[in-house]
Amino acid sequence: MTGAATRFAFMVILMIAAGATAAGVPEPDGYRLQDYRAPTPATLQGARVIRTDEAEMIWHSHSATFIDVLPRPPRPRDLPAGTLWRDKPRANIPGSIWLPDTGYGELAPSIDDYFSKGLYKATEGDHARTVVFYCLADCWMSWNAAKRALALGYSEVVWYPEGTDGWLAAGLPLQDATPEPRPDE
């Protein structure tokens, strides 16, 4: 084999191995509780799983509400007076609602209530409205949030595991995001 053919064969083997590894991640019985930035399952029982091309079609059709669940570090409570604090910027899919910190495996009661009320507001109380959950690629937070929406009785739950990483890689637009206000802020 030539050098180019050997490199090509090696790349194919790596891609197959990577796909097999990602496909082999089982769904846990409950929520993922740690190591949130890790390969995710290919499925979420009760939800539809989509790739970027389908997410783009849904976005263009305005047929769903997109929910970003990327966490956001809170402003430290013990900052001295006069200390300048800047939130880390977040760019998400245009038109999305950002409900930060709602993808952890265990939620404080106030954050659980924030998620429930935020989702209710985003869907105008329509539990049959299509809701697309996302975060970043290889991020369990969107998986957990989508699973939580199913537990709340939402019937048209869509999980977009590629998140803003896949969206940006496809050359699609992102916009600066502002999170929905949290009760503890």
Model-derived segments and their meaning:
Residues V69-P73, D78:
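Surface-exposed acidic loop/strand-edge motifs in secreted or periplasmic proteins
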Residues M1-F10:
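Bacterial N-terminal signal peptides that target proteins for export
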Residues M15, A20-D53, I58-S61, R77-P80, ...:
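Rhodanese-like catalytic fold shared by cysteine-dependent sulfurtransferases
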Residues A55, T65-L70:
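Short hydrophobic beta-strand that contains or immediately precedes a catalytic carboxylate
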